[in-house]
């Protein structure tokens, strides 16, 4: 009887192990299915301009990104305030850059010189003027990044000029036309200041209302693509049909 009882217990243990093993496998498979579904949902979310990284990483992920996205409000406000004061001085008050630099330098050097000279008479320690130098690695990084961006711009311009992508060509022409109109209505300094203000406001507002902006951008892109298809059928296809095919063959051979 004892052996039969042990045999029944071993059978029950095997059955329970199989049941628990099936539950574990089913739960793990369901978890993996949930992970896959959540991952697929994440990939389906539309991001403006096909963005795949957070906005902070797109700005470099360092101190410049913290400044533009107002992670440090004092520094961001100071930079924007300095840009505003500079624009007021040079644009509204029509102050000359060299004149301003000369006056500030004269005032600063005079104060430092008088304080250092008078410190021995008033029995106070002279001012400690720190050494100022530009690190070489920072300059090399900036130069390397600027070189890469300039070369990338040259590559894009070459592709556009070669006649391979008519859509990109029309977009660039429209952008340059808008830029020329804006440049004719305001000078270069005002344009730089407007770009600075936009750089300090649009990214942080976009980060705050990201989902709403992306949803609106998705609808806008659908409408733009729809209008472009109609424009392509009604206008571009007719224009391209009138251009001799030998011209494009000549361009391809030249490339």
Curated annotation (Swiss-Prot):
The keyword Transmembrane applies. Residues 1-25 have a biased composition (Basic and acidic residues). The modification N-acetylalanine is found at residue 2. It is found in: Endoplasmic reticulum membrane; Vacuole membrane. The lineage of its organism: Eukaryota, Viridiplantae, Streptophyta, Embryophyta, Tracheophyta. The keyword Lipoprotein does not apply. GO terms for biological process: endoplasmic reticulum tubular network organization; response to bacterium. It is a multi-pass membrane protein. Keywords: Acetylation, Endoplasmic reticulum, Membrane, Transmembrane, Transmembrane helix, Vacuole. This is Reticulon-like protein B3. One of its GO terms (cellular component) is endoplasmic reticulum tubular network. The gene is RTNLB3. It comes from Arabidopsis thaliana. Residues 64-255 form the Reticulon domain. InterPro entries: Reticulon (IPR003388), Reticulon-like (IPR045064). Residues 1-38 are annotated as: Disordered.
């Amino acid at each position: 009887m004892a052996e039969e009882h042990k045999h029944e217990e071993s059978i029950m243990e095997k059955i329970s192990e199989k049941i628990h093993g099936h539950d574990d496998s089913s739960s793990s498979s369901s978890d993996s299915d949930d992970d896959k579904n959540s991952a697929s949902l994440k990939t389906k979310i539309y991001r403006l301009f096909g963005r795949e990284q957070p906005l902070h990483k797109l700005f470099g992920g360092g101190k410049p990104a913290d400044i533009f996205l107002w992670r440090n409000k004092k520094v961001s406000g100071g930079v924007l305030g300095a840009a505003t004061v500079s624009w007021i001085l040079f644009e509204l008050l029509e102050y000359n850059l060299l004149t301003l630099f000369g006056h500030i330098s004269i005032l600063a050097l005079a104060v430092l010189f008088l304080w250092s000279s008078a410190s021995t008479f008033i029995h106070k320690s002279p001012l400690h003027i720190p050494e100022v130098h530009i690190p070489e690695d920072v300059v090399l990084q900036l130069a390397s990044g600027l070189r890469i961006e300039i070369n990338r711009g040259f590559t894009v311009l070459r592709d556009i000029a070669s006649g391979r992508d008519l859509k990109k060509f029309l977009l660039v022409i429209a952008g340059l036309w808008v830029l020329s109109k804006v440049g004719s209505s305001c000078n270069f300094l005002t344009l730089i200041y407007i770009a600075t203000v936009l750089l300090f406001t649009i990214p942080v507002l976009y980060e705050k209302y990201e989902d709403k902006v992306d949803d609106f951008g998705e609808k806008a892109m659908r409408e733009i693509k729809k209008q472009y298809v109609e424009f392509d059928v009604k206008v571009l296809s007719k224009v391209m049909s009138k251009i001799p095919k030998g011209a494009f063959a000549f361009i391809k051979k030249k490339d």
